[in-house]
Amino acid sequence: LFEPNSLYSPIMIEREISPRLEALYSQYPFVTVTGPRQSGKTTLCRAAFPDLPYANLEAPDVREFAETDPRGFLARYAEGAIFDEIQRVPDLLSYLQVQADEAGRNGMFVLTGSEQFALSDAIGQSLAGRTAILRLLPFSFDELARTDASTLVDDVLYSGFYPRIHDQHIEPRQALGDYFETYIERDVHSLAEIRNQTSFRRFIRLCAGRVGQLLNLSALGADAGVSQPTARQWLSVLEASYIAFQLPAYHGNVRKRLVKAPKLYFYDVGLASHLIGIEATGQVATHPLRGALFENAMVMEALKFRLNRGRSSNLSFFRDQRGLECDLLYATGEGTIALESKSGATFAPDSFQALDRVAAAVSEVRHEAVVYGGDEVQKRTRGTVLPLAELSGWLGEMDAGA
């Protein structure tokens, strides 16, 4: 039933979140790592804590034991353990709380889960104040560069960042197709009773075709052939399972009338590419949504930078009613960074014009950067020009608190 973790020794790309995970383990009785399926949660935790025993609660026999005899199950783990997919047995959390409270020490249990909201609710009821929570997304650009995978922009927009694709050299079209089918068959069923699978599949593909756009649930639902309340429910399912992400609009103290609707992105740009029908790297360059996919990759790279350091999202976008827009505002304790994405490999000097106007409207803006599809860092008078691959390192310089 149970695997001794000492036998687990995968070849692993070191994840940027590892130091934070290890530090928090010494400060809390529990650390909970959540994130998409196949983002590397199990590999991360088992490699970080090789001396902890491991149990996968998705295995039917393990789950049955934990559900029917929780005290007997936990008796095997008096000194702590890694429990994978803890949301499958939410009632176990109350028993874990008692066991950890009786032990009275930090560094006991590491929990993983891939259902964002259900897991948060369960933890809030049983482990409030006792667990640190980390979110692990697929590889960042820097992590991808540690593999032998291509980091050319079009290759990345096609293949995405799921570790399994790059660790095991799986054809992205096959891997992402399998991921999507497994998601529909397993996760969607556990999260919601969706009767019309055909409409739901259409809905997901429509969402992928709208990355980087303002979210309009009425239009999205109409195109999918469902009501607005149904579209809202289905989008919440995509968010709960780490498929889709809503970037909030900036609502600071400015005199302009601002757009309030969020923008829609996918946690993995490769999955979005797959769902809009891209089947090879060569199709990316001429695809009409290439710019939106590049913007998606930029936003996720900034989000991964935060989450990999144990920080919450500090991201928003700016758009006023007259169309003045900035793709991404990144707030820090020392001011805000305004970022614009330009997927072309050649930098156009007028790219800073809109950023300058946004900086004039948003007094907190201290730095401006254009993230583009080229490969050269350029320090300009008005700001910095960055390749996508350099964004994380540059944010590290700008955000001293991260």
Residue ranges and their predicted role:
Residues 41:
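Conserved lysine of the Walker
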Residues 33:
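Hydrophobic anchor at the beta1->P-loop junction of P-loop NTPases
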Residues 44:
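Hydrophobic positions on the alpha1 helix immediately C-terminal to the Walker A/P-loop
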Residues 117-132, 149:
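Short regulatory helix/loop adjacent to the ATP-binding pocket of P-loop NTPases
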Residues 148, 373-402:
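Domain-level recognition of nuclease-like catalytic cores that cleave nucleotide substrates
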Residues 93-111:
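Conserved catalytic/switch belt of AAA+ P-loop NTPases
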Residues 11-24:
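Pre-Walker A adenine-sensing motif
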Residues 170-336:
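Accessory nucleic acid-recognition modules appended to NTPase machines
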